[in-house]
Amino acid sequence: MGQKVNPKGLRVGVIKDWDSRWFADKKDFGDYLVEDHKIRELIKKESFSAGISSVSIERASNKIKVTINTAKPGMVIGRQGAGVEELKNKLEKLTGKKLIINVEEIKFQDLDAQLVAENIASQLERRISFRRAMKQTMQRSMRAGALGIKTMVSGRLGGADMARSEGYSEGTIPLQTLRAAIDYGFAEADTTYGKLGVKVWLYKGEMLPGMTEEDLPVYKNKKNDKNKKRRNNNRKGKSQAAKN
């Protein structure tokens, strides 16, 4: 049987960039790798409800630049920047190095596989039926402009004695096409029957050479829709003013 490889790892260096961008000697490589893992774990733990999708880490001499991609930047930053300052102090204490933290907002949450997976997991923890949780979330992503989505939930579904996996898919998911921009997310739900694993594959279109993720048709259509709404609102405002 053919096993499924992580779609992000398969596309690194082709259409995706690394989440950790630094170079190290043999003696330092292991330490840096463990440090990156600890940084990500601490950020996830401290800002669990902020909807963090990914954390990018860059290193230069004795400085670390951390970029947090989140759906709720206000929760990470806190009032007058108190939250991000507290997080920075904790990370500096953990690493013993100077840190720069950037917080970037994810504008389209339904088009981020990690956030979609975490959304399904949170619904499962609230005892919502796994079929309903998957189908509703998939419909939202397809309405948001995704070209295809596949979800899978594994574990003791519905409290059954034997663990099993159940999944649904909609649209197209070309996993073997390396230029296909497929986002992958994984989350765990802690239920009274044990842990349930949630996997999400989300297809956003083909990424051709020289393109960035923002150039994908999914995001371009979203921007065009926003501009259309703005123009329509301006026209309505002008026509009402003319009538008055």
UniProtKB/Swiss-Prot annotation:
Respond yes or no to whether keyword Ribonucleoprotein is given for this record.
yes
KH type-2 domain boundaries:
39-107
**GO terms, biological process:** translation
Compositionally biased tracts (Basic residues): 220-238
The terms describing its cellular component in GO are: cytosolic small ribosomal subunit
Question: Which SMART domains does the record associate with it?
Answer: KH
Q: Which stretches does the entry tag as region Disordered?
A: 216-244
Q: How does it assemble?
A: Part of the 30S ribosomal subunit. Forms a tight complex with proteins S10 and S14.
Q: What is this protein called?
A: Small ribosomal subunit protein uS3
- State the organism named in the record: Finegoldia magna (strain ATCC 29328 / DSM 20472 / WAL 2508)
